Design a protein with these regions (language model features):
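N-terminal nucleotide-binding beta1-loop-alpha1 segment
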Residues: 22-41
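Hydrophobic targeting segments
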Residues: 26-31, 54, 69-70
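Short phosphate-binding loop-to-helix
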Residues: 78-128, 137-140, 144, 189
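Hydrophobic helical membrane-anchoring modules
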Residues: 8, 19, 218, 229-231, ...
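Short, Lys/Arg-enriched N-terminal segments with co-localized hydrophobic residues
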Residues: 4, 8-21
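Conserved core of the sugar-phosphate nucleotidyltransferase
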Residues: 107, 135-232
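Conserved SAM-binding loop
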Residues: 46-47, 71-72, 129
């Protein structure tokens, strides 16, 4: 376990954790899909290998045995119809104030959970966030992350990580006079040390987030205080045209293997 002040970070080996005999709590998957993308217009419903991109995340959620319910949170009636076509529920249309490019994930999930509680008296124990910009992910990774949270009550959430290619121990701030100061100060002169002697660090991707509902409703957070890390090597986040091409090639190659 790594700790940083009040936050603790647990590293999980990428092993098969999920077991079919454990189904004791309600797990909700939420796929947030706003319509106002600026980098690539309507990227969440853009066709990739013949299907809207959001369809892949819906299919991943529906295929995961550990997920009990799948909803899409969107501000678009058009997106809602597409989501329903591929099997997701769309119990509400997200208010415009939670669909801007500055809206926080916390606002989006507080709204979704509040709506479900007030209108359906429904409150899951665990929430899985699957962003639609990741059309490639393994069902087993979703299952492993859910099961880890079920088996470890000390953890508030689980996040995907991968070893960082660029490490903060070799990074700097620079002031207006071009004077450098190191970002990391916990290791003396870390910038002069061989990389192999420095602590191993990870960056987070956003492919899968799993967290307890109470993290949002009681702690006003998307992670809580104890964050477990699940290593995932592949990461196909789509934000540019180049990303689309790479993901399409990967999906096509995977289909050809079947």
């Amino acid at each position: 376990m790594f700790s940083d002040g009040m936050y603790a970070f647990i590293y999980i080996e990428n092993t098969k954790l999920w077991r079919e005999d454990m189904k004791e709590c309600e797990v909700l998957a939420v796929i947030p899909a706003r319509s106002g993308s600026k980098s690539v217009v309507d990227k969440n419903i853009r066709l990739i290998n013949g299907k809207p991109m959001i369809a892949y995340s819906i299919e991943h959620a529906l295929k995961a045995p550990g997920i009990d319910r799948v909803i899409v949170s969107t501000d678009s009636e058009k997106y809602a119809e597409i989501a329903k076509k591929y099997g997701a529920e769309v119990p509400f249309i997200r208010p415009a104030e939670y669909a801007t490019d500055t809206a926080l994930d916390l606002d989006v999930f507080r709204h979704a959970l509040s709506y479900l509680k007030e209108n359906e008296n429904y409150m899951p124990n665990i929430v899985v966030q699957l962003r639609p910009t990741y059309p490639i992910r393994k069902i087993q990774d979703i299952e492993n992350m859910i099961q880890y949270l079920k088996e470890h009550p000390e953890a508030d959430s689980v996040r995907c990580i991968a070893p960082a290619k660029e490490i903060p121990y070799k990074m700097w701030f620079m002031d207006e006079k071009n004077i450098l100061s190191p970002i990391m100060k916990d290791v003396p002169e870390c910038y002069n040390m061989p990389r192999q002697q420095l602590p191993k660090v990870y960056y987070q991707n956003a492919c899968i987030d799993v967290f307890r509902t109470t993290v949002v409703t009681e702690k006003n957070s998307m992670t809580g205080d104890v964050i477990a890390g699940y290593q995932m090597d592949e990461n196909y986040d789509i934000d540019t045209e180049e990303d689309f091409l790479k993901a399409a090639e990967k999906l096509k190659a995977d289909l050809e293997k079947l």
